[in-house]
């Protein structure tokens, strides 16, 4: 008998045991259906564990296949190393079995159930309060009505903050916060590996390429989003992005003088065949494809926002409140890796400004946006939401000072804000405001300023701005890369989040709605609603695609429709 035969039987025994483990867990998942009051969060964690176990089972199978060595001793060489790896996997499996047994035996933690009941009670008490106070308002007039309405809104705010605080703590109980941290980190590392692999082909002369010119006729935030759009198409079509940035309006030396190159091995656009974008299928045999701006893109591929990769969608839905934003943020993260001089600038600015937490970021865009793409918003509109969020933060952390990082292209606003709100500490660099003016916009000093503003806005605990501004949306996107889920860490005074040139943003009705006014539209569960915007008053505006009717509908009666797309990737990128 050959020496490897015994080892092979031993390996088969391990695989059999592993399969038994998967069957055991699967059985538990089925039996858990008899207890519908189990937390959906608990089920998500178990499913995530099962997915990891399946992956490890597949790893073991591949390792076992590789151990089919026809001859030679097994106590040395590659086979020996693989067997030791199998032993380590087995130890990990035993640990996971024990952890799972403890979890299923103990059920949900005490803190989880206490918080769940507190939230349930808080919702009931809020309803009782609303009914009572609104009945009182019916019988009041004049100054008494105004006084009672003000008290009513103040008390309502306390109720809302109480429930939101309990929800925050609930999201952290029973290891959920730790799981979310790890899952977000794992997903980010996976995507960054895939991007890095695609951007660094072994042979640039043979690589399929997509060429993108940075000089779109707009500002920094718009140009960055233009490159992100190019990058997402390159990723979806499995091409290496070639970024042409020589004579960039902001820095004539090009992108690489500010940020790290998008590729270490392939920056040359040359190839056998070159052509303009004609669609993924028609361009299949074209080595180098030039991409137009998104406004002129035809045909439109499915890789545009707000789609996310099909193979990541389930994990993203569990870990993040807005998977589409998270996916966009991964390309922003890769693109804006700073050169050493910029890193130093950011560090020095952080010390000079005294930037520290807690802090809320406020971005006020004036100049060219007002009257064209956005309405004028006084500082008071922003500060209402700043104060509300500081009151919420104070329920779970020590707020020594109410700090606000103020980014604006209006140099007079800092003085106005300090005068009107003396109890706040405003952190701002007025030289950046001056450089953001139209007459100074396309300079290296202006570029430095907008990069610093975006950096500090993204670092804030909460963001108040107008999503009609590209700078604000870039800051929000970067914020997603700094936390497991920062999807709710903002308030926009105008638009909901969008990506310029995106495909349709759809929602799905989960409750029926009968219109009460001519401005509203009817809905039935399952109807697809194309959302145009949120009015931030409990209602959104959109079109019922089944009926073709446009109007208002209650925002709580819909959920986001997650669009997925198959994106190919090579196994080598997973390593």
Curated annotation (Swiss-Prot):
Please give the start and end residues of each transmembrane region: 10-30
Q: Which residues lie on this side of the membrane: Cytoplasmic?
A: 1-9
Q: Which GO terms describe its molecular function?
A: alpha-(1->6)-fucosyltransferase activity; glycoprotein 6-alpha-L-fucosyltransferase activity; SH3 domain binding
SH3 domain mapped to chain residues: 502-563
Report the protein name in the record.
Alpha-(1,6)-fucosyltransferase
Region (Important for donor substrate binding) residue spans: 365-366
* Family membership: Belongs to the glycosyltransferase 23 family.
Name the gene behind this protein: FUT8
One GO CC term on file: Golgi cisterna membrane
Q: Which organism is it from?
A: Bos taurus (Bovine)
- Chain positions found as Phosphoserine: 278
SUPFAM superfamilies membership: SH3-domain
Give the matching Gene3D superfamilies.
3.40.50.11350, ESAT-6-like (1.10.287.1060), SH3 Domains (2.30.30.40)
The record's annotation in PROSITE patterns points to: GT23 (PS51659), SH3 (PS50002)
Report the EC number(s), separated by commas if there are several. 2.4.1.68
Q: What class of enzyme is it?
A: transferase
Q: How does it sit in the membrane?
A: Single-pass type II membrane protein
Tell me the InterPro entries matching this sequence: Fut8, Fut8_N_cat, Fut8_SH3, GT23_dom, SH3-like_dom_sf, SH3_domain
- Specify one Pfam family: SH3_9
């Amino acid at each position: 008998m050959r020496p490897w035969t015994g080892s092979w039987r031993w390996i088969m025994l391990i695989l059999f045991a592993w399969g038994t483990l998967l069957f055991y867990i699967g059985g538990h998942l089925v039996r858990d259906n008899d207890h519908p009051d189990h937390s959906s969060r608990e089920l998500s964690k178990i499913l995530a564990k099962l997915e990891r176990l399946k992956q490890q089972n597949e790893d073991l199978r591949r390792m076992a296949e590789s151990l089919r060595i026809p001859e030679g001793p097994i106590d040395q060489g590659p086979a020996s190393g693989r067997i030791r790896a199998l032993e380590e996997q087995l130890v990990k499996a035993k640990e996971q079995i024990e952890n799972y047994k403890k979890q299923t035996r103990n059920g949900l933690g005490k803190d989880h159930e206490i918080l769940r009941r507190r939230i349930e009670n808080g919702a009931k008490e809020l309803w009782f309060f609303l009914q009572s106070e609104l009945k009182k308002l019916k019988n009041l007039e004049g100054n008494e009505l105004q006084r009672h309405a003000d008290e009513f809104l103040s008390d309502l705010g306390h109720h809302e903050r109480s429930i939101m605080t309990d929800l925050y703590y609930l999201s952290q109980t029973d290891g959920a916060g730790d799981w979310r941290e790890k899952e977000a980190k794992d997903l980010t590392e996976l995507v960054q590996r895939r991007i890095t692999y695609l951007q660094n082909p072994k042979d640039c002369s043979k690589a399929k390429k997509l060429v993108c010119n940075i000089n779109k006729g707009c500002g920094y935030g718009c140009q960055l989003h233009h490159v992100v759009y190019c990058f997402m198409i390159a990723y979806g079509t499995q091409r290496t992005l070639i970024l042409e940035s020589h004579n960039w309006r902001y820095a004539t030396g090009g992108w690489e003088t500010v940020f790290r190159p998008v590729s270490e091995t392939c920056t040359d656009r040359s190839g056998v065949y070159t052509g303009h974008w004609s669609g993924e299928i028609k361009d299949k045999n074209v080595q180098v494809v030039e991409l137009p701006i998104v406004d002129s893109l035809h045909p439109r591929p499915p890789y545009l926002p707000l789609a996310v990769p099909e193979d990541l969608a389930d994990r993203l839905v569990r870990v993040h409140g807005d998977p589409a934003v998270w996916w966009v943020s991964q390309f922003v993260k890769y693109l804006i890796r700073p050169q050493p001089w910029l890193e130093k600038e950011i560090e020095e600015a952080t010390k000079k400004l005294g930037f520290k937490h807690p802090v809320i970021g406020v971005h006020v865009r004036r100049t060219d946006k007002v009257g064209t793409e956005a309405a004028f918003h006084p500082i008071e509109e922003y500060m209402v939401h700043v104060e509300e969020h500081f009151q919420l933060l104070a329920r779970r952390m020590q707020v020594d000072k109410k700090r606000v990082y103020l980014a604006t292209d209006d140099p007079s606003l800092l003085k106005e804000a300090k005068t009107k709100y003396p109890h706040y500490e405003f952190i701002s660099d007025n030289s950046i405001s001056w450089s953001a003016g139209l007459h100074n916009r396309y300079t290296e000093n202006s570029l430095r300023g907008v990069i610093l503003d975006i950096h500090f806005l993204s670092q804030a605990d909460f963001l108040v701005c107008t999503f009609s501004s590209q700078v604000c949306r870039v800051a929000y996107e970067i914020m997603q890369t700094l936390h497991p889920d920062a999807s709710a860490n903002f308030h926009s005074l105008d638009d909901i989040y969008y990506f310029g040139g995106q495909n349709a943003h759809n929602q799905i009705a989960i409750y029926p709605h009968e219109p009460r006014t001519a401005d509203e539209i009817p809905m039935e569960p399952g109807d697809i609603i194309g959302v145009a915007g949120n009015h931030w008053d409990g209602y959104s505006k959109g079109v019922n695609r089944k009926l073709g009717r446009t109007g208002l509908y209650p925002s709580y009666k819909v959920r986001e429709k997650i669009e997925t797309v198959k994106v190919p990737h090579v196994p080598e990128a997973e390593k």
